[in-house]
Amino acid sequence: MKRDIKDLLNPALRNIAVYKVDGGQEAAVKLNQNESPFDLPFWMKEQILEEFRLEPWNRYPDILPFRGMDAYADFLGVSRDSVIMSNGSNEMLYTIFLACLSPGKKILIPEPSFSLYEKIALLLQADIVSVPMQPSLDFDADSLIERAKQEKVDFIVLSTPNNPTGKSLASPDIARIVRECDAIVLVDEAYIEFSREHSVLALIEECPNLIVLRTMSKALALAGMRIGFAIANPLLMAEIAKPKIPFASSRFAEITLQHVLRYYYLVTDAVSYILGERERIYAELEGIASLDVFQSDTNFLIIRVPDAQKVFHALVSSGILVRNVSGYLLMENCLRFNIGLREENDQLLEKLKSL
């Protein structure tokens, strides 16, 4: 008799669920996926499409997207051999984890953090060392360093600013972790453009164990293009590149990135708007007695309500989609929503005040 199909698969799959977005991805007011509320202007899309029209569609793209890597390296002011572009930062996460983890290797993950970290670590049969955030949802840098040393971890991943908490780890504390811990340290800066803290990109040259991860899905409004980057010391980057999927990024994504970087003032304007709205909404939420709101360094806010599931469904019934993040450690009855257009934000505020 043949074995059950599940017995032929990676045993880690038994402890992993398919990724899903509760509530779906369609709503009149969609604030559940931390997207930018601003699409690219039509005139830029026309320029991008005209350039892409001239590309050979029957040919593979470059093994690695060198045009995109050159453009982003120039933008950051780093060498090209310090940069790799990927098909979204999630693909880069898989690549980095493949390069750094194997059965028995130890990875330290602050909890809560982006759920994909744990999922990939489980798939690779690595040992996960979890370090809880403080009750305020802030990082505990001393505990991170202490546990990393005690457990002799091989790999540390830090989402800062953090998803789902919205909190940043102070830049000097990141530097301490990178310098004091005998481990590869991945700093996921998906939301860095919205943070009060500085990027740790400047540490790349002096810290051979540091990797910085970036996405173009948030501040650059390119979630649909799937563009991510890793930046690291060239010697480390050469190793990370080994498990990288070849031909994974399209020419279309490269061309789009080049145009957005050329007109970066549009990104700066959008970020300024989001930061202003974040502060306005935060102040409004502070005046609602039935909820607590947390300070944020991202393009989203976290609120704690008496009954998150009830409020979530009430919002959905009004055409407003947010994210229920109550399942995360320390985040019972918490909801997350990104900053939208002003009229969308006002609809959310009005509904929350009425509940």
Curated annotation (Swiss-Prot):
InterPro entries assigned: Aminotrans_II_pyridoxalP_BS, Aminotransferase_I/II_large, HisP_aminotrans, PyrdxlP-dep_Trfase, PyrdxlP-dep_Trfase_major, PyrdxlP-dep_Trfase_small
Keyword line: Amino-acid biosynthesis, Aminotransferase, Histidine biosynthesis, Pyridoxal phosphate, Transferase
Cofactor: pyridoxal 5'-phosphate
Catalysis: reaction(s): L-histidinol phosphate + 2-oxoglutarate = 3-(imidazol-4-yl)-2-oxopropyl phosphate + L-glutamate
Tree of life domain: Bacteria
Classification via SUPFAM superfamilies: PLP-dependent transferases (SSF53383)
Pfam family for this entry, one: Aminotran_1_2
Identification of the protein by name: Histidinol-phosphate aminotransferase
Source organism: Chlorobium limicola (strain DSM 245 / NBRC 103803 / 6330)
UniProt lineage: Bacteria, Pseudomonadati, Chlorobiota, Chlorobiia, Chlorobiales
Gene for this chain: hisC
